[in-house]
Design a protein with these regions (language model features):
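Short, Lys/Arg-enriched, disordered terminal segments
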Residues: 1-4, 170
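TOPRIM fold recognition
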Residues: 22, 34-170
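Acidic, glycine-rich catalytic loops of TOPRIM or P-loop NTPase phosphate-binding modules used
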Residues: 4-48
Length: 170
């Protein structure tokens, strides 16, 4: 069973998100290293944030930047010596047991998603394939930049109902 966290897990790159999504059911936001978009910061403000960044020097610099922008963030740090897969020393190279052990204290018993939106609804509402409409919805809900898949996940994680979504589109 996947771990559901009481907050949004923030990681550096897509490889980290892909690796962790096999074990964590919560929303995972990728900050793309030092190039953290303002829309991502805006989306994360006011939410429970769990920072899980690479234990290298670059990861520490990104952590420092995010902590200054999002001061109530929870910092989860992995021992660099536990990252033994391959030559890189990032979250995606760490042993999953070590990561889950560190994240377990932020876990909740069940998934809190109450949204009634299905992915097929996004197709019917023309949110998949219509970048302008998707951007309008994302801007109104302060969801940051989203492709169709990310929009779906963020709507679910923010418990946006189908009725609310239809009202925004009108």
């Amino acid at each position: 069973m996947k771990l559901f966290l009481d907050g949004i897990l923030v990681v550096e790159g897509k490889e980290d998100a892909s690796y962790l999504s096999n074990y964590v059911a919560s929303e995972i936001v990728v900050v793309n290293g030092f190039e953290i978009p303002d829309t991502t910061i805006s989306y994360l403000k006011g939410k429970q944030i769990i920072l899980l960044l690479d234990p290298d020097e670059a990861g520490q610099e990104i952590r420092k930047k995010l902590n200054s922008l999002l001061p109530n963030s929870i910092n989860v740090e992995i021992d660099i010596n536990k990252c033994t897969r391959g030559f890189k020393k990032g979250v995606a190279e760490c042993e999953i047991d070590e990561i889950l052990h560190k994240l377990k204290i932020y876990a909740v018993n069940k998934n809190k998603i109450d949204s009634d939106i299905k992915q097929s609804d996004l197709y019917q509402l023309d949110l998949i394939g219509n970048r302008e409409l998707r951007k309008k919805v994302c801007d109104k809900l302060n969801l940051g930049n989203c492709n169709g898949k990310t929009l779906y996940r963020r709507l679910l994680n923010n418990n946006i109902s189908l009725e609310q979504l239809c009202e925004i589109i009108k």
